[in-house]
């Protein structure tokens, strides 16, 4: 860690800004917002500085910089377009042990200014240590889009309720659940955003008067196909609020690192032909944990309602009157095809797409004549062990043996591998692939050579050494 991130209390503290141009103006806004007693030194000033001075918000010190201006100052920012002046400010500040920042010159700075997301009292600072300021700005823009504007009001509300919550709830677990409900209360957040104080107060009282929940709840969350970046925002929120996370082997390690640290983790991994934990037992685990009053997340790879047996698990909960909800995820067909450069539909190749399980019930025969029809894309989930039979059935029902096919192994991850060939080779190709793999059949596979964009190869040496 090159820099220690700290938040400074500048209310009424004497600060100096050297520079009177547009860049200095931006720094002045930050210092004024933080309540600094600001003096600005420059030979000339933008109209905005004169306006602030007229309002009594800052003091202008016209003329060249001199070390005397640093007397009794808490910090200084040098923001001129003259390198020699900025260097002099830094030198004098060091001699007088005053914190100094030189704009766009981190080597001449005892502190640097991060990109800031201001939702006071919630503050988020993003810094690259001066190495990639544009990247820091882009990250700030992404966070700005995610964090609602009323977040500050919500934090202020939380601060005002701390003592009451401490008296009302005797144990830490109850307090934590109250705070999670308060901060996740969509209608309360909307009331604050609308400045509807009366409604917000009623909603808060309802939270305090709410009787302890005898029964917990289960949230079925789709983790997506592998890349942690494909986990939905709502899915992330749920796994960070869970008391218990029940997950299988298709959930990547990267996603599991996002789970709340003190949550209990129950692994129920399954493989085709070998069920580590029987489905009925998984259903009972969900039921029992919810009956203990816990917030349970059933985390599944892909989308839980597409060959994820999510419906079966929810039926058990519904029969027992356990509250549940579903957060959909990006299914493997969508994620793997996108990361392989294979569009599932295309005006010149496929007007429909069919998602097919390679492990249908023994009495659930597939309509192979329909599957073998042209102008469509077939995606087989869990089809490796049945690949030879899939090949035989499709060719027997009229699909050309030369139809392009692709097997996507560990799709969307850094270990992704794509094996291409023709339908007549599918059974043999499957022997080269490992689970989890997805089989894509159709002429859209031929577009991969032109549309592939994702490189699954990790760099063999640090990027810094390549530069």
From Swiss-Prot:
**Which residues act catalytically here?**
248, 270
SUPFAM superfamilies, per database record: NAD(P)-binding Rossmann-fold domains (SSF51735), Siroheme synthase middle domains-like (SSF75615), Tetrapyrrole methylase (SSF53790)
Where on this chain does NAD(+) bind?
22-23, 43-44
> Where is the stretch described as Precorrin-2 dehydrogenase /sirohydrochlorin ferrochelatase?
1-204
The record's keywords, sorted A to Z, are:
Cobalamin biosynthesis, Lyase, Methyltransferase, Multifunctional enzyme, NAD, Oxidoreductase, Phosphoprotein, Porphyrin biosynthesis, S-adenosyl-L-methionine, Transferase
Region Uroporphyrinogen-III C-methyltransferase: what ranges?
A: 216-467
One Pfam family for this entry, by name? TP_methylase
Tell me where in this chain the PTM Phosphoserine is found.
Answer: 128
Q: InterPro entries, alphabetically?
A: 4pyrrol_Mease, 4pyrrol_Methylase_sf, 4pyrrole_Mease_sub1, 4pyrrole_Mease_sub2, CobA/CysG_C, NAD(P)-bd_dom_sf, Siro_Cobalamin_biosynth, Sirohaem_synt_dimer_dom_sf
Entry keyword Transferase: yes
> What does this chain do?
Then it catalyzes the NAD-dependent ring dehydrogenation of precorrin-2 to yield sirohydrochlorin. Finally, it catalyzes the ferrochelation of sirohydrochlorin to yield siroheme.
> What is the protein named?
Siroheme synthase 2
Q: Which organism is it from?
A: Serratia proteamaculans (strain 568)
């Amino acid at each position: 860690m090159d820099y220690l991130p700290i938040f400074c209390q500048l209310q009424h503290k004497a600060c100096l800004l050297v520079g009177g141009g547009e860049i200095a103006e931006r720094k002045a806004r930050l210092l004024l917002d933080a309540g600094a007693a600001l003096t600005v030194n420059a030979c000339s000033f933008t109209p905005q500085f004169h306006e602030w001075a007229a309002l009594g918000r800052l003091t202008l010190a016209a003329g060249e910089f001199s070390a005397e201006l640093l007397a009794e100052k808490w910090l200084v920012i040098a923001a001129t377009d003259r390198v020699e002046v900025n260097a002099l400010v830094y030198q004098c500040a060091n001699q007088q042990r005053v914190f100094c920042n030189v704009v766009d010159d981190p080597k001449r700075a005892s502190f640097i200014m991060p990109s800031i997301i201001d939702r006071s009292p919630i503050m988020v600072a993003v810094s690259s240590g001066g190495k990639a300021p544009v990247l820091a700005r882009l990250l700030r823009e992404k966070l700005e889009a995610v964090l609602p504007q009323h977040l500050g009001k919500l934090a202020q509300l939380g601060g005002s309720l701390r003592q009451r919550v401490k008296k009302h709830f005797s144990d830490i677990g109850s307090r934590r659940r109250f705070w999670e409900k308060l901060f996740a209360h969509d209608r309360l957040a909307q009331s604050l955003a609308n400045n509807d104080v009366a409604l917000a107060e009623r909603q808060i009282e309802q939270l305090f008067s709410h009787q302890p929940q005898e029964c917990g709840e289960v949230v079925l969350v789709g983790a997506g196909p592998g890349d942690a970046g494909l986990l939905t925002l709502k899915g992330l929120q749920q796994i960070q609020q869970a008391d218990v996370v029940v997950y299988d082997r298709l959930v990547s390690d990267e996603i599991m690192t996002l789970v709340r640290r003190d949550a209990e983790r129950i692994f129920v991994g399954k493989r085709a032909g070998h069920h580590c934990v029987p489905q009925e037992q998984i259903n009972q685990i969900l039921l029992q944990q919810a009956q203990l009053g816990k917030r349970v997340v059933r985390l599944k790879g892909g989308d839980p309602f597409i060959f994820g047996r999510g419906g079966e698990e929810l039926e058990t909960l519904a029969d027992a009157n356990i509250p549940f909800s579903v957060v959909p995820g990006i299914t493997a067909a969508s994620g793997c095809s996108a990361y392989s450069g294979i569009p599932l539909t295309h005006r010149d190749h496929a007007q429909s797409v069919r998602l097919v399980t390679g492990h249908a019930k023994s009495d659930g025969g597939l309509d192979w004549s329909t599957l073998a029809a042209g102008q469509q894309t077939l995606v087989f989930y869990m089809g490796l062990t049945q690949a030879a039979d899939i090949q035989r059935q499709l060719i027997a029902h009229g699909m050309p043996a030369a139809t392009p096919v692709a097997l996507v192994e560990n799709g969307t991850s850094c270990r992704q591998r794509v094996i291409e060939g023709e339908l007549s080779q599918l059974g043999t190709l499957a022997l080269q692939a490992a689970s989890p793999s997805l089989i894509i059949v159709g002429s859209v596979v031929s577009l991969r050579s032109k549309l592939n964009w994702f490189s699954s190869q990790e760099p063999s040496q640090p990027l810094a050494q390549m530069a």
